[in-house]
Amino acid sequence: MASSASKFIKCVTVGDGAVGKTCMLICYTSNKFPTDYIPTVFDNFSANVVVEGTTVNLGLWDTAGQEDYNRLRPLSYRGADVFVLSFSLVSRASYENVFKKWIPELQHFAPGVPLVLVGTKLDLREDKHYLADHPGLSPVTTAQGEELRKLIGATYYIECSSKTQQNVKAVFDSAIKEVIKPLVKQKEKTKKKKKQKSNHGCLSNVLCGRIVTRH
């Protein structure tokens, strides 16, 4: 129990500026949408979280997507276990930058680290007033998000809204699963090996017993 409880997972959010990364983190950690002041970068956060029976200590790191932070941002990538790569469902540019900017950056500074692809601001995609105020806007569809997920090799693609809290928890649950999945598989393999060894021992005893009986 102690080993699973002490497992630390460093989760880093990345993506263009103004896609809602900080709001998503605030919403996840406080269960409310920030209406007054939204900081540029969310303070690092750590808490014990239980996902599928496994307790982990989840550490959340926020990053600023603006170009001014291009040199500083990669310092947050060191030791990352998983990335939450975000784009806005109502920003075609942020969607395109996932493949053009963020994947090359992550592959350069943190190769091999798994990621969860997230489309934010889900509530605005169907908001008639918002769409009317932004003529010519072409929201990203679920199918296009899935297509991008396959292209970048992400296991999960989740659409969420910090304002309504829809799927926000699912984002970070998926990030945790992405890290603990190999650990669970390894535990299962170890259990299987122990069981096979135990069964082999029992079989040997039975055979030995038979030999003794024949004598």
UniProtKB/Swiss-Prot annotation:
Asked if the keyword Ribosomal protein belongs to this entry, the reply reads no
Q: Which keywords accompany this UniProt record?
A: Cytoplasm, Cytoskeleton, GTP-binding, Lipoprotein, Membrane, Nucleotide-binding, Palmitate
Impact reported for C202S? Affects the membrane location
Recorded topology in the membrane: Lipid-anchor
The UniProt GO MF terms for this protein read: GTP binding; GTPase activity; protein kinase binding; protein phosphatase binding
- Motif Effector region extends across 37-45
The compartments listed are:
Membrane; Cytoplasm; Cytoplasm, Cytoskeleton
Q: Where does GTP bind?
A: 15-22, 62-66, 120-123
A Gene Ontology CC term for this entry? plasma membrane
Q: Does the keyword 4Fe-4S apply?
A: no
Write out the S-palmitoyl cysteine lipidation residues: C202, C208
Q: Which domain of life is it from?
A: Eukaryota
Look up the record and give one Gene Ontology term from the biological process aspect.
negative regulation of abscisic acid-activated signaling pathway
A Pfam family recorded for this sequence: Ras
Record function comment: Involved in local disassembly of cortical microtubules when associated with ICR5 and KIN13A.
NCBIfam families attached here?
small_GTP
Quaternary structure annotation from Swiss-Prot or TrEMBL: Component of the active ARAC10-IRC5-KIN13A complex. Interacts with ICR5.
Spell out the family assignment given in the record's similarity comment.
Answer: Belongs to the small GTPase superfamily. Rho family.
Protein name (record): Rac-like GTP-binding protein ARAC10
Source organism = Arabidopsis thaliana (Mouse-ear cress)
- Which gene is this protein's source? ARAC10
